[in-house]
């Protein structure tokens, strides 16, 4: 069985094909598998189309490939030129591989290198072309291979013929092959009488001539060719686009030919010898004739000293170049600037210089004296100084205080201190030093240091004296203490000078309260006279029981008003209580249970003002949606001393934009501040007395109701409405029977200030919790469920207590700010006097209870205060 081979060439190329058939070497005997496969694809459906080549059996070797189709065979060691994927390649040593590869180019034939991609047919290289390349290659292999740099040095030094270059020889092979096939195509096109078309083949195969080349020049270098280093089909020639310039539009551009590494122009007029002489020229260089658009050369010059060089070149601040602006500016001639423009530029530069001087950190600017100038003033037209020549100094006397010490200029005064230290505590000397001061010192600004208000100045001086005195242990020194929101309970037992009156001037001597005469000064009671009782039970008392004299006194007396910064356009003040009782005969009696049920409110100066509405506190822990509802209190037969530290009621803070103190800081102050243990806020009103020690009001029905509601809300935690979860109170009473296991929070009793106080535990130890909750845990069926419930309850109680602490701190701060902003007004005929501009300090706190724990009745001081009002007016 014989395989079809490449068709026989036509008579036109007989000079090439016949000689090639007769003188072919041994490598030609073995067909290229690529060629056989291509021929099989073209003639698989044709019978007896291809004529097999005649081969002599004398030169056949036993291991040479036969015409039969064999899929696998052992290759001949001498046959290395055949490169096919069907061959079995055995591993060999490195030296043997290099030796075989070096001889492969010598044994390589002219087949299997070129292919027409349009017709998918292999194209043979003409023998003359291949023979020339083969001979030159032998000569190169016989001599030592030199590098390109050695070749360049040899050509420059001597006139030796350079070695054969592969790139140019490959280009010559490609160009000669394409020219040969173009010539044969032209000759066949002239001979139209001879039919070279096979009558049998439906594929239009011609056996008398090589396949015609397509006008698209689809000749490619096969991937299997050893000349192809990329192992991909590489086009042999690339056609460049035509010239774009009108001068060269009729000129044809020379194409680029593959040279083994890239594409370069092939010199068509050069012969092989001339080609070899021009081997060392760079292969990828292009001549100037290939430029379709010639370079535009413009001689443009501009001054680099020009300040607006960037503007002239069209370069903006972001380094963007505007070529249109650049071209317009460079083409237009630069106009000579006029004289006026130069003058304007000089003025601008002078201004810039002055601004630079002013921007320096130096404090002194030396202005030269025109009389002592070394250079005479210019008398030209520009910048004449005739006006300054006639200048005479003014006759106004200079101020004697302006005495510049030449030695102190440009030097740092190390002895300068600000403010001047005053070691003397005497007020007169301090004022004297302030008024006199360093009059001769130029560094001080001369301003009027007299105070706007004498009372304000005296108050400020008193605070300075208190601050300076080292032996003064007064706890009310006005220092800023972040941790103290209210005064300690120790401040209550101290005696102070003022109650609700502004501080007296420093010129008036302050008389101690213990040794003061009641005729000359007001007797300071232990309870503030501004605190009156307001009880709903007063409606039952007949109007005759109320003293008209006392009522007039209440209208005349100036009571501090509550100043609140509203969030909305609503004035937040309290209505005056209509029922005010004064019983002078009960001076030495204790509080009645009806009066003790209600907190004491500060009466407002206005007669009829809308009431204060509750608001949502800006707390970081809780924001209550509904206001706390408290039922009408009922009397409780119990002394307030037994209830101190036991009642924890919620307070509705009012609309004051004060920052709420954090609960962590509040809880951390419990050890240092005694008032955190003993102060309790009222549930009826958010306004407490001026002593920051709120009153205590408890009634039995409220306690029982709150206690029941609290237990229900805690048991149904997370299931009830918001009112049950948010509205809470912790009433604790000794007389109220309650078991420890009924309470949902853990408390311990501690002795503080000689009293047993029950303290709520937020985070307790495990052993204490086990002891306190032994009874409650017995009711729980599952231990894990009890643990989860207890954790939830602790978390809820912690949030509740922290919210109460926030509210307490907010209320205390609000009261302090209210007391600071109070304005006391006293008028004889009920006429309101103008308020003073000076800031009035808050009234000083007073104790609620005496040393024995009995509450103080404010009514027992009413008569004495009422009698001392005229004397107080005389003092003012």
Curated annotation (Swiss-Prot):
Residues 135-147, 476-485 have a biased composition (Basic residues). Residues 49-85, 135-172, 241-293, 419-446, 466-551, 628-700, 712-742, 826-845, 852-876 are annotated as: Disordered. One of its GO terms (biological process) is mRNA processing. The modification Phosphoserine is found at residues 81, 172, 225. Its main location: other. Residues 628-641, 685-700, 723-738, 856-866 have a biased composition (Polar residues). The keyword Phosphoprotein applies. Phosphorylated by CDC28. It comes from the Eukaryota. Keywords: mRNA processing, Phosphoprotein. Interacts with PAP1, REF2 and PBP1. Involved in 3' mRNA processing. Positively regulates poly(A) synthesis. This is Factor interacting with REF2. It comes from Saccharomyces cerevisiae (strain ATCC 204508 / S288c). The gene is FIR1.
């Amino acid at each position: 069985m014989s395989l079809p081979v490449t068709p026989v060439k036509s008579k036109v190329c007989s000079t090439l094909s016949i000689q090639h058939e007769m003188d072919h070497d041994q490598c030609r005997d073995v067909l290229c598998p690529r060629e056989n496969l291509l021929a099989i694809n073209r003639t698989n459906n044709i019978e007896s189309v291809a004529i097999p080549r005649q081969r002599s059996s004398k030169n056949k070797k036993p291991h040479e490939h036969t015409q039969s189709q064999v899929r696998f065979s052992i290759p001949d060691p001498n046959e290395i030129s055949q490169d096919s994927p069907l061959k079995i390649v055995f591993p060999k040593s490195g030296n043997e591989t290099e030796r075989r590869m070096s001889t492969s180019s010598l044994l390589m034939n002219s087949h299997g290198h070129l292919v027409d991609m349009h017709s998918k047919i292999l194209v043979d290289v003409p023998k003359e072309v291949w023979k020339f390349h083969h001979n030159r290659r032998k000569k190169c292999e016989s001599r030592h291979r030199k590098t390109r740099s050695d070749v360049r040095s040899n050509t420059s030094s001597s006139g030796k013929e350079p070695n054969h270059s592969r790139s140019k020889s490959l280009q010559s092979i490609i160009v000669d092959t394409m020219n040969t096939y173009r010539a044969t195509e032209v000759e066949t096109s002239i001979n139209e009488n001879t039919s070279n078309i096979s009558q049998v083949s439906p594929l239009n195969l011609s056996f008398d001539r090589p396949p015609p080349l397509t006008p698209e020049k689809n000749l490619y270098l096969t991937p299997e060719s050893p000349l192809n280093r990329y192992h991909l089909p590489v086009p042999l020639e690339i056609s460049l686009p035509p010239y774009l310039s009108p001068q060269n539009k009729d000129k044809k551009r020379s194409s680029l030919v593959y040279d083994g590494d890239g594409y370069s122009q092939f010199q068509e007029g050069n012969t092989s010898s001339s080609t070899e002489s021009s081997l060392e020229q760079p292969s990828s260089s292009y001549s100037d004739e290939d430029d379709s658009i010639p370079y535009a050369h413009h001689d443009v010059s501009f001054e680099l000293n020009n300040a607006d060089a960037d503007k002239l070149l069209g370069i903006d601040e972001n380094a963007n170049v505007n070529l249109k602006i650049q071209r317009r500016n460079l083409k237009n001639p630069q106009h000579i600037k006029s004289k006026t423009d130069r003058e304007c530029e000089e003025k601008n530069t002078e201004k810039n210089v002055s601004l630079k001087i002013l921007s320096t950190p130096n404090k002194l600017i030396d202005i030269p004296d025109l009389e002592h100038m070394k250079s005479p003033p210019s008398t030209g037209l520009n910048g004449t100084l005739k006006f300054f020549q006639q200048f005479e100094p003014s006759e106004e006397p200079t101020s004697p205080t302006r005495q510049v010490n030449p030695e102190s200029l440009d030097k740092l005064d190390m002895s300068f201190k600000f403010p001047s230290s005053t070691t003397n505590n005497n007020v007169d000397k301090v004022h004297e030093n302030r008024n006199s001061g360093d009059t001769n010192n130029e560094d001080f600004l001369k301003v009027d240091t007299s105070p706007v208000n004498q009372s304000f100045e005296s108050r400020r001086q008193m605070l300075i004296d208190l601050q300076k005195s080292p032996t003064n242990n007064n706890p009310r020194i006005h220092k800023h203490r972040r941790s103290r929101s209210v005064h300690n309970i120790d401040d209550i037992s101290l005696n102070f000078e003022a109650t609700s009156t502004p501080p007296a001037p420093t010129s008036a001597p302050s008389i101690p309260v213990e040794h003061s005469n009641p005729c000359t000064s007001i007797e300071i009671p232990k309870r503030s006279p501004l605190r009156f009782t307001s009880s709903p039970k007063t409606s039952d008392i007949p109007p005759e029981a109320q003293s008209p004299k006392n009522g007039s006194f209440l209208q005349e007396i100036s009571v501090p008003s509550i100043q609140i910064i509203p969030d909305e356009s609503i004035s937040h003040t309290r209505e005056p209580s209509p029922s005010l009782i004064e019983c002078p005969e009960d001076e030495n009696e204790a509080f009645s249970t009806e009066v003790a049920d209600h907190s004491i409110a500060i009466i407002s100066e206005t007669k009829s003002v809308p009431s204060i509405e509750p608001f949502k506190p800006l707390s970081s822990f809780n924001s209550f949606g509904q206001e706390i509802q408290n039922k009408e209190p009922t009397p409780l037969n119990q002394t307030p001393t037994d209830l101190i530290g036991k009642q924890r009621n919620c307070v509705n803070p009012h609309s004051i934009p004060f920052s709420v103190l954090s609960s962590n800081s509040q809880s951390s102050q419990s050890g240092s501040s005694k008032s955190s243990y003993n102060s309790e806020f009222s549930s009826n009103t958010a306004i407490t007395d001026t002593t920051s020690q709120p009153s205590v009001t408890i009634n039995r029905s409220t306690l029982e109701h709150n206690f029941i509601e609290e237990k229900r809300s805690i048991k149904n935690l997370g299931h009830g409405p918001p009112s049950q979860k948010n509205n809470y109170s912790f009433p604790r009473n000794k007389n109220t029977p309650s078991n420890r296991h009924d309470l949902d929070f853990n408390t311990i009793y501690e002795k503080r200030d000689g009293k047993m106080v029950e303290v709520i535990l937020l985070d307790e130890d495990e052993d204490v919790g086990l002891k306190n909750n032994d009874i409650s845990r017995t009711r729980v069926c599952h231990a894990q469920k009890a643990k989860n419930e207890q954790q939830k309850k602790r978390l809820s109680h912690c949030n509740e207590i922290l919210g109460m602490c926030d509210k307490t701190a907010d209320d205390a701060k609000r009261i302090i700010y209210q007391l600071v902003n109070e304005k006391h007004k006293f008028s004889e005929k009920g006429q309101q006097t103008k308020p003073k501009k000076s800031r009035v300090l808050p009234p000083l706190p007073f104790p609620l209870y005496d040393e024995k724990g009995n509450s103080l009745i404010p009514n027992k001081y009413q008569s004495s205060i009422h009698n001392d009002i005229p004397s107080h007016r005389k003092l003012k």
